[in-house]
Regions:
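Short active-site neighborhood of thiol/selenol oxidoreductases, capturing the structured segment around
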Residues: 432-462, 475
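Bacterial Sec-dependent N-terminal signal peptides
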Residues: 1-34, 555
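Structural microenvironment flanking redox-active thiols in thiol-disulfide oxidoreductases
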Residues: 454-495, 509-513
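Loop/turn elements at helix/coil->beta-strand transitions in domains of secreted/extracellular proteins
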Residues: 439-443, 472-475, 497-501, 530
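A non-transmembrane, solvent-exposed segment enriched in polar/low-complexity residues
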Residues: 27-195
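Non-catalytic, surface beta->alpha helical segment in thiol-disulfide oxidoreductase systems
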Residues: 521-524, 530-555
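Short, internal strand/loop/helix patches
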Residues: 490-526, 530
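Oxidative protein folding and maturation machinery
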Residues: 131-440
Length: 555
């Protein structure tokens, strides 16, 4: 099962390196702006309201390309809505969603109003009318999106690859730019484009090209991409716009950088860095250990006689030191292959990537360690936002931990409608446990893991699906396992608060259930009848709510 794991670094490898000090990057302070998005859906019908009682405004975070940060805005009886979102960059690409209707728009600090008419939602190509900040730009953007939808050729990655095959990186950049900007240039032939919209669209194209080049360089093991193509054409630091293309390009950059240090796996960090970590985070050292650590952190070279002491310290505090060592080791290797601005992003990206896969106590530890090293104020604000989202439920997490810790085969309601169960059963006996809790209801089972991003997204989708179903006669059972810890699973449940039965099993139990579900991937879903028998083994996942609802209606 795919998961992100920490590698424990052999202590002896630490002694292969001389001391190298670590300086904290000086950073400036920057406060986020905000934008208020309001509007009204005229002639809103009861049917439309029941289908979608909220509109959703979402935005990107430059450190997590695959995640949209969504803010629901409840619809008032007259169809009006209002929501305020933070902004990290001067201009950010936001997304409006209402049922099956969506559009992108450009936001900056201030107020933006969006007007729609329910009578023409599915009749007009451009049912949106903007006013307020960037009104002219967004109205023109809406019209351009209609043109783009009708005229943009279907993307063909293989054809693009053939066009740049054997070409230099700079030639490839020019070829790709021409390919990606063709539709926009065609639109410009008959329309006068506002300067801000022109900058915004060209910024997106630049990063779309950069993402392709980073992917190509990773596949071809090209270590000279950022030498042959100016970094200003790949990831300019002073760009005013935050778009999904920019976040994606930087994500590809992180993968490219990781590919360049793949042969460094197993190598450690300077012994002085290790000593500094011990000095900062470990308190229960003996006088002898403390004295030697003080010597090592001030530049003394480690010797073979230090080996047993370092091993003992690491073994006693592996849960704390292992995560810090992974970070420091990775940065020490990356520092040799990327520039300082790139390293700044990679520091922030490391934490942003790992936050969802580690427990609360380790989230706090890594945040306190890494945040002071991040210099770019936009990365700092982006990281702060993601961290706050992860720890905002800490009180709930602690309350759940107080109620549920070591119970086996004893269901415990930890929150209203949220029951936790640690099971020792396998296969059919595990399903019998679900049936006992269902008490004659249908049972929708989601097999998932907090270690895997796709699973975490399905858990979120399941909660939204439950809200659509209301009080329907069905029990949601979430069967989870984690190669990290039971605590990570429990904390993920506490954050999500999806109602139903949450069951933790070990990996061999999990595999026995997956075999019964006849699935070879995680996450997976199945539907059980009131008698506990399989109705649909390979059921649609919660992220396909229409298919799930159709299946339930048939039963």
């Amino acid at each position: 099962m795919p998961t992100l794991r920490y590698k424990i670094i052999p202590v002896f490898s630490l002694l292969l390196f001389l001391f190298s000090g670590q300086l904290l990057v000086a950073y400036g302070q920057l406060k986020s702006d905000s934008v208020t998005v309001s509007g009204r859906i005229k002639n809103l019908t009861i049917q439309l309201y029941r289908q979608s009682p909220n509109v959703t405004i979402s935005r990107n975070n430059i450190l997590q390309a695959s995640r949209e940060l969504a803010r629901p805005a409840p619809l008032e009886p007259d169809g009006s809505f209002k929501v305020t979102l933070p902004l990290v960059y001067p201009y950010e690409e936001l997304y409006f969603n209402f049922g099956q209707i969506s559009t992108a728009f450009l936001a900056s600090a201030g107020t933006i109003e969006i007007a729609l008419d329910a009578d023409s939602l599915f009749l007009s190509d451009a049912p949106f009318r903007f006013s307020g900040a960037n009104a002219q730009v967004n109205n023109q953007l809406t019209r351009y999106k209609v043109f783009e939808f009708k005229n943009k050729p279907k993307a063909d990655g293989r054809q693009l690859t053939r066009k740049v095959e054997g070409r230099s990186a700079e030639d490839s950049r020019k070829i790709l730019t021409n390919e990606f900007i063709t539709t926009y240039e065609k639109y410009r032939e008959t329309h006068e484009i506002l300067p801000l919209l022109d900058q915004y669209i060209k910024s997106g194209v630049k990063y779309e090209v950069a993402a392709f080049l980073y992917d190509k360089a990773s596949a071809e093991q090209d270590t000279r991409l950022e030498t042959n193509v100016p970094i200003s054409n790949l990831r300019p630091a002073n760009d005013l716009f935050l778009t999904v293309q920019r976040a994606t390009a930087l994500e590809r950059f992180s993968l490219y950088a990781a590919s360049r240090i793949a042969d460094q796996d197993g190598r450690g960090i300077p012994v002085g860095t290790f000593a500094n970590l011990v000095d900062r985070y470990i308190r229960d050292l003996s006088e002898t250990e403390r004295a030697r650590i003080n010597e090592l952190k001030t530049g003394r070279t480690g010797t073979n006689r230090d080996m047993p002491m370092l091993q003992r310290i690491l073994q006693r505090h592996q849960d704390t030191l292992a995560k810090l060592l992974v970070y420091e080791t990775r940065m020490s290797h990356l520092r040799k292959v990327v520039d300082t601005t790139g390293l700044d992003y990679l520091k922030a990206n490391f934490l942003a990537t790992n936050l969802p896969t580690i427990e609360l106590k380790n989230q706090e530890l890594l945040y306190q360690h890494i945040m002071p090293q991040v210099g770019d104020p936009h990365y700092r604000l982006s990281l702060e936002e993601l961290y706050r989202l992860e720890v905002k439920d800490s009180a709930t997490i602690n309350a759940v931990a107080a109620k549920f810790s070591k119970q086996i085969n004893q269901p415990v309601e930890v929150l209203s409608g949220v029951t936790l169960l640690r099971s020792s059963r396998y296969g059919k006996e595990l399903i019998e446990q679900f049936q006992a809790q269902a008490q004659g209801r249908l049972i929708y089972v989601l097999a998932w893991s907090p270690d895997v991003e796709a699973s975490r997204l399905e858990l979120q989708a399941a909660r939204a699906l439950q809200e659509q179903l209301g009080s329907r006669d069905i029990l949601f059972v979430y069967v989870g396992t984690s190669e990290t810890s039971t605590e990570l699973w429990r904390e993920s449940v506490a954050k999500n608060k999806a109602k139903g039965l949450h069951v933790f099993v070990e990996t061999d139990q999990f595999d026995s259930l997956i075999a019964l579900m006849r699935s070879d991937v995680v996450p997976a879903a199945t539907l059980l009848g009131r008698d506990g028998k399989f109705i649909k083994r390979d059921a649609p996942l919660p992220s396909k709510p229409d298919e799930v609802l159709k299946l339930l209606r048939e039963k």
